[in-house]
Regions:
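DNA polymerase processivity clamps
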Residues: 4-112
């Protein structure tokens, strides 16, 4: 994995609450956003500024960034994860209890 720009822990309960929203509201995107000292996991439609948007705080940071992932690409088994985001537009998810990890591409318009 290229240099890790941002690292944090993602609780299963936080991910599942956002997953429920993007599934029920048919939101195509999720984002990890670093702003005002917080890392937020956001369900949204980045192409429609009038769409619903919901977020949960998952960590703290001193960086400003937005890392977009297509919701359809978030096919991970339930569990708590250590997450690393890279400026090279890669997200790395490592399950804390099961020996499984995922590398998921970030969208091209992600910014760090």
């Amino acid at each position: 994995m290229p240099d890790k720009t941002v690292t944090f822990s993602l609780k299963n309960s936080d991910y599942e609450s956002v997953k429920k929203l993007y599934t029920n509201l048919s939101l195509p995107d999720i984002a990890f956003k670093g702003e005002k000292g917080k890392i937020k996991l956001v369900a949204l439609d980045k192409k429609n500024s009038n769409s619903n948007e919901s977020s949960v705080t998952v960590g703290e940071t001193d960086l400003e960034f937005t890392a977009y992932i297509k919701a359809e690409n978030m096919k991970i088994i339930p569990g708590d994860y250590d997450v690393a985001l890279s400026k090279a537009k890669i997200a790395h998810f490592i399950n804390k209890k099961v020996k499984v990890q995922y590398w998921i591409a970030l969208e091209a318009d992600s910014t760090f």
